[in-house]
Regions:
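Aromatic-capped interface at the extracytoplasmic side
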Residues: 8-26
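Soluble "head" domains of membrane/secretory-pathway proteins
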Residues: 17-20, 28-162
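Hydrophobic alpha-helical transmembrane segments in multi-pass membrane proteins
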Residues: 4-8, 80
Length: 162
C-alpha cells in the first residue's frame, strides 16, 4: 500500500499539472510564487464544492494567467457582502477572519447560475475574484481543476491544501 501511494505521488510530480500562485490573494493558505498541483480529473466526476480551492482561466481566456481561488458559493446560491461580511443564502460565512473592505459587485445580491461558482481569495482585501465585474461568476467550463497539493513555500513545506 505504501509503495502504491509513493508511486502515485511520483507519477503526479512527474506528470502532474502545476501552476504558480501569483500574488498574496490566497495568503495565508498559499503565497505568491508557491507552486500547486492541479487535479484535472476530479471535476469530470464530481462538482466543485464550497471550500474547494480551484484553478481557472477567467472567462476562459487562454492568454490570461491562471487564478487560484476558493469556492465560496455553488450553483443556485445567493451571495452578498454587507458590512464586511460574506453572506451565502442569507447566512454569514466564516471563511475570512478580516472584514471584507471591498464588496464589489457583491454589494447587491448575486445569484450563482447553473454550472457557475462564486470564488474569492483567502486574503479578500488583496484579491481579484468574483467580486470584480471583469471576472464575476466562474463557469465550470473554465475550471482547470482542483488545487490539492502545495509545494514548499511560505511557512509550509509540502502538503495538502485545505
Amino acid at each position: 500500500v505504501v509503495g502504491a501511494i509513493l508511486l502515485s505521488y511520483v507519477a503526479v510530480f512527474a506528470f502532474g499539472v502545476r501552476t504558480t500562485v501569483i500574488g498574496d490573494s490566497m495568503s495565508p493558505t498559499l503565497v505568491g510564487g508557491q507552486e500547486v498541483l492541479i487535479n484535472r480529473l476530479v471535476y469530470n466526476i464530481f462538482e466543485p464544492r464550497m471550500g474547494d480551492v480551484i484553478v481557472f482561466k477567467p472567462n476562459g481566456n487562454e492568454n490570461a494567467h491562471t487564478y487560484v481561488k476558493r469556492v465560496v458559493a455553488t450553483p443556485g446560491d445567493k451571495v452578498r457582502i454587507m458590512n464586511g461580511i460574506l453572506y451565502v443564502n442569507d447566512a454569514p460565512e466564516e471563511f475570512f477572519t478580516d472584514s471584507i473592505a471591498n464588496a464589489g459587485i457583491a454589494s447587491s445580491e448575486i445569484k450563482v447560475g447553473e454550472d457557475e461558482y462564486f470564488v474569492m481569495g483567502d486574503n479578500p482585501n488583496s484579491s481579484e475574484d468574483s467580486r470584480n465585474a471583469n471576472i464575476g461568476n466562474i463557469k465550470k467550463s473554465t475550471i482547470m481543476g482542483k488545487a490539492w497539493f502545495h509545494m514548499a513555500g511560505g511557512t509550509e513545506g509540502l502538503g495538502r491544501i485545505r
